Amino acid sequence: MKVYAPATIANFGPGFDVFGLAIETPRDTVIAKESDDFRIEVEGYKVPENDENVALVAAKALFKLVGEEGGIYLKLKKGIRPKSGLGSSGASSIAGAVAAARILGVEDDEIIIRAALEGERKASGSPHGDNVVPSYYGNFTIVESLNPLRVHNIEVDFKVVVILPSVEVPTSEARKVLPKKVPLKDAVKNIALASSLVLALKEGNLEEVGRLLEDHLALPYRLSLVPWFPKVKEAAKEAGAYGVMISGSGPAVFALGENLKEIGKAMKEAFESFGIEAEYWVTKVGRGAKWC
């Protein structure tokens, strides 16, 4: 059995730990079969091939949640670069959880998500759902609550340009720099931005969505980890981008607009001015985890 889980853009501007967007490219793939124990092999980007692997952690968690014994063999084709800001651990966790669910005949979304969150906990230290939820459901997702699971899904149809520089930002490190408290005016601003962004998405107003891609809760405190972002954003805007933002905790950046290839080229040149190599691609919105 084979499971595909797409990369994701977490936060999507003002929706810290709440908003997420699945993208079609890249993705992780898991080939799974029943086994007497829990084992994993990995192809592609280098990640652990033992109990530290988040796909295996998620698969084990699902077995435990439903009270099943036994095991599973996973072959993970790692297509999403770790520490990229594109939900690498979230996609692997969803792939592992879905694989275990299909083998055991589990169809309960909440159990699958809860198992995948254990993979995210392993990777980043906290079970945040803004990567695993869109990777599972696809489209644009809003995580209202994880316990109980309350998720809202908005079907959207547009393309984004994503650029990934040759630097890493571990999610665990990016979360450490965040303050315990933020100014009330910043919280109010993000609520206004997030509410307006959801409305713009529902109306299909991509230019307005781009304008609302701001963040006053996390990005100001993370700029020390992504010091090149203001210049990359400026280059994208000059090339015609509606909006530009860090994907997740970075370093990946995404932009909305019409001339996406030109925007990607402009961002690449901006990265190169810092001596940083980067690759960009244009992708559609992803439709969630799939299996066959």
UniProtKB/Swiss-Prot annotation:
<dbReference type="InterPro" id="IPR013750">
    <property type="entry name" value="GHMP_kinase_C_dom"/>
</dbReference>
<dbReference type="InterPro" id="IPR000870">
    <property type="entry name" value="Homoserine_kinase"/>
</dbReference>
<keyword id="KW-0028">Amino-acid biosynthesis</keyword>
<protein>
    <recommendedName>
        <fullName>Homoserine kinase</fullName>
        <ecNumber>2.7.1.39</ecNumber>
    </recommendedName>
</protein>
<dbReference type="GO" id="GO:0005524">
    <property type="term" value="F:ATP binding"/>
</dbReference>
<keyword id="KW-0791">Threonine biosynthesis</keyword>
<comment type="similarity">
    <text>Belongs to the GHMP kinase family. Homoserine kinase subfamily.</text>
</comment>
<keyword id="KW-0963">Cytoplasm</keyword>
<dbReference type="InterPro" id="IPR014721">
    <property type="entry name" value="Ribsml_uS5_D2-typ_fold_subgr"/>
</dbReference>
<dbReference type="GO" id="GO:0005737">
    <property type="term" value="C:cytoplasm"/>
</dbReference>
<dbReference type="InterPro" id="IPR006204">
    <property type="entry name" value="GHMP_kinase_N_dom"/>
</dbReference>
<dbReference type="InterPro" id="IPR036554">
    <property type="entry name" value="GHMP_kinase_C_sf"/>
</dbReference>
<dbReference type="Pfam" id="PF00288">
    <property type="entry name" value="GHMP_kinases_N"/>
</dbReference>
<keyword id="KW-0418">Kinase</keyword>
<dbReference type="InterPro" id="IPR020568">
    <property type="entry name" value="Ribosomal_Su5_D2-typ_SF"/>
</dbReference>
<comment type="pathway">
    <text>Amino-acid biosynthesis; L-threonine biosynthesis; L-threonine from L-aspartate: step 4/5.</text>
</comment>
<dbReference type="GO" id="GO:0004413">
    <property type="term" value="F:homoserine kinase activity"/>
</dbReference>
<keyword id="KW-0067">ATP-binding</keyword>
<dbReference type="GO" id="GO:0009088">
    <property type="term" value="P:threonine biosynthetic process"/>
</dbReference>
<keyword id="KW-0808">Transferase</keyword>
<feature type="binding site">
    <location>
        <begin position="81"/>
        <end position="91"/>
    </location>
    <ligand>
        <name>ATP</name>
    </ligand>
</feature>
<dbReference type="Pfam" id="PF08544">
    <property type="entry name" value="GHMP_kinases_C"/>
</dbReference>
<comment type="function">
    <text>Catalyzes the ATP-dependent phosphorylation of L-homoserine to L-homoserine phosphate.</text>
</comment>
<keyword id="KW-0547">Nucleotide-binding</keyword>
